[in-house]
Amino acid sequence: LPFTYPPFAALVFLPFAFLPLEVGKAIMVLGTTAAAWWLSATIYNYAQTSGRALPLQGRLGRTGTIAVLTIVVMLCGPWRRTFHLMQINPLIMALILADFVRPATRVPRGVLVGIAGGLKLTPLVFGLILLVRRDWKGIAALVATFLATIAIGFILLPNEAPQFWFSAI
């Protein structure tokens, strides 16, 4: 796809247009770092609940292990590149991971993946997980949420949305 960011993404990040560039960068760096910390905490919690000890966990404790994991995540090439380009991929990854690891609630799985798909088209591939699981409610939630992001784009960006959906992709 030549352009994978739908109009909904522009709406979500519109507030950044009113901020000084350095403030926007600082917010993105803090958000990306928070996403790395949350990912690391999620990995730690998964290891705990599955009975798998992480290296150095005994010496570092919970906070130390999560801090080391966060550093490792942030040193990975894709994450470093995200800092350089100020991309939204950590936010998208956090939405997808949160959708699949959160406890079951009245809100079906798929909602957060649908929002992530509204920000960038590629996360929609995670709908295949719901399909393999035969989670029809989750698939319906994903599709409905994604369609809602498209509708919001058409309502609030009536010139740009048709251009994106009918020309850019």
Regions found by a protein language model. Name each.
Residues 108-131:
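Membrane-interface alpha helices of multi-pass inner-membrane proteins
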Residues 1-109, 133-169:
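Primarily membrane-embedded glycan-assembly and transfer machineries that use lipid-linked glycans
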